[in-house]
Amino acid sequence: ADSPGDALDLGVNREALALRGSARWQQAARDADLSFPNGAGQFACALGVAIDAQRTPHLYTLLERSRIDASAATKAAKRRYQRARPFLRNAQAVCTPGDLDDLRQSGSYPSGHSAIGWTWALILSEIAPERADALIARGRNYGESRLVCNVHWQSDVLAGRFMGAATVARLHDDPTFSADLAAARGEIAAARAAGRMPAGDCTAENAVLQVRPASAL
């Protein structure tokens, strides 16, 4: 018999599948892109300033490096558990069909995207505590995009958050990380003073991200 955890995974997956083809599904496809420079902009609306390599170089580099750290933190567990992803069980579409070959070869548990999103949310909340509520919410719904995309189970996403938090805790032992935090804080202050807002439609993004599987944690 399925455990309560399995039942939750299946229930959330059913709710997520109902969002296929919606604006939230399209947002999940955009959230899947971790390549830079696109990845640097995933949290720009939540932060409230534009992020780019030219005008916020320390912040840009901090996000890029921490992406690598958080991704690395999940790889051993993915290899160990080799959990089948939802689309392999339910035979339904994913929001990024071009990634299918890679997804089939990579274990579902834990979610690397969720780990990265949570890492970014925690780091950015330290740099800009006045935006912490929006940033933490973005970290959560960034992971939930993997549910909507039909490539992760709820338990994968939760485990990803744990791995993200562990990644940030380890980074705090690195003096270079602390220096980068301070430099990034100054860049954000300068960007706010200059009125450099995110390029995207943040009102529309925020509205779309309010849509989530009802039972998601």
Residue ranges and their predicted role:
Residues A1-V148, D180, Q210-A214:
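Hydrophobic alpha-helical bundle signature of multipass membrane enzymes
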Residues Q82-N90, V157-A165, R185-I188:
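Short alpha-helical linear motifs
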Residues L103-R104, R161, V168, A193:
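Alpha-helix boundary/capping detector
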Residues N141-H172:
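Interfacial helix-loop-helix junctions of multi-pass membrane proteins
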Residues H172-L217:
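Acidic, carboxylate-rich catalytic segments that either coordinate divalent cations
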